[in-house]
């Protein structure tokens, strides 16, 4: 991950990067055992991570070109598709491992997984890449990680 000065300095990209970064920070805080309150919500973080991570993973595995074109203003080549498919299958496997309760502490794993993805995914994309920041493009990723962070620290 580059620590260079952000390439994208417009308010939309900086604001959305902040949204997903706050979500990532909340997820890391929850990983350490930190909480900021208790909400009785109908979904927990592990379920949320399985659904959102599993759907993104399936999308990147089965239709990488579609997802890349939906989210970024860059030409897609066979290398992009390869890396997207490779990432997608790992997301699907993580979802399976969470679902199968194959971790000692699925909550901590979900926090760590989603926290890392928040920073390496939408936050980095908003700061350094050419994401399509639209409601049908990249904006939902920022919101998903923020919601994941809120779920994590209020469980």
Where are the regions a protein language model picked out?
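Interfacial loop at the N-terminal end of multi-pass membrane proteins
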Residues: 65-84
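Alpha-helical membrane-associated segments of multi-pass integral membrane proteins
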Residues: 134-151
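Membrane-water interface at the C-terminal end of transmembrane alpha helices
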Residues: 25-33, 125-126, 146-155
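Core segments of alpha-helical transmembrane spans in multipass integral membrane proteins
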Residues: 50-60, 78-103, 115-118
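Membrane-interfacial loop-to-transmembrane alpha-helix junctions, especially the N-terminal start
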Residues: 43-46, 105-114
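Cytosolic juxtamembrane helix and N-cap/initiation of the first transmembrane helix
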Residues: 5-21, 27-53, 78
